[in-house]
Amino acid sequence: MNTQTVGYKAKAFEARNLAFFFLIALGAKLILGLLIFFELPQYPLLAIPLFGILFSPSGAAFIVTGLTEGKTGVRALWRRFWNRNVNFKWLLVALLLLLVLKLFAGVLTQILIDPSYPLFEKESISAVIFGALYGLYAGLTEEFGWRGYALPRFQVKWNALASSIFLGVISGAWHVTRYIAPGEILFGANFWEWFPWHRLIQIVGYTWIFNNTNGNLLALVLFHTSTSYGGFINLDVWTYCGVMLVAAILIVAVFGPKNLVRQKSEKVEQKQVHAMSD
């Protein structure tokens, strides 16, 4: 059966295929995290990163798509990385939205908490470069899976807001090992103080951009990249979460929880979907 995604929604929920996808993505991550945590067994230098890429959410998406839809489905999933019809303004939104929110949160931190608090780190350039490269890698290894494969199928069954929350919980579980495995970039950080609120609020932005670009994955990879290159901005964590919460509420209020797409834009998207389906 042809269940390829058209636009930002799939043609069917595909519960079994979704379960297979999450089993690969979450199971492999758990195994990898445990191997690193217990330092067992001894492995070649490149074994861990290669294993992580192959069985990442993106890797799992291509595996399941290849098994269920063949080469045609794999090519269709890959082509979602670039859509010539994507509006350039959404690429800018993807790159700059979180940076603007972080700057705003940094300024609020100075005003409300400590006027002497420095807004920028001293080594800003190196922080931006490292953050951008790490975020780009993470985006490429995750977004074909979370948004390219799972989100369109979730939106067949639930509205955009509910789909965002459900996917946020699952993808959040996938990230837990980054807080407990030695050598991971977030090892030792306080998971409960930061990640759940940050992730669940931020994930509304992912779905909002995904749906308004008709399922474009380049925009999502850029947005994922932007989550990492703003580390040179000093801010209070809870102030930033508050700023993101307000932004998420505004997005839902203006665009609506059903599709996170304004009605006029949604009609245009539906016409594009019908044209692609014909």
Map each language-model feature to its residues.
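Interfacial helix-loop-helix junctions of multi-pass membrane proteins
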Residues: 180-189
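Specific transmembrane helices
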Residues: 2-139, 232-278
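Membrane-interface helix/loop boundary segments of multi-pass membrane proteins
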Residues: 141-168, 211-216
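Hydrophobic/aromatic residues in alpha-helical transmembrane segments
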Residues: 104, 137, 150, 202-206
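Residue-level signature of the transmembrane alpha-helical core
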Residues: 26, 55, 95-96, 128, ...
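Functionally important transmembrane alpha-helices
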Residues: 188-249
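Juxtamembrane/interfacial segments flanking transmembrane helices
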Residues: 70-75, 142-151, 181, 217-218, ...
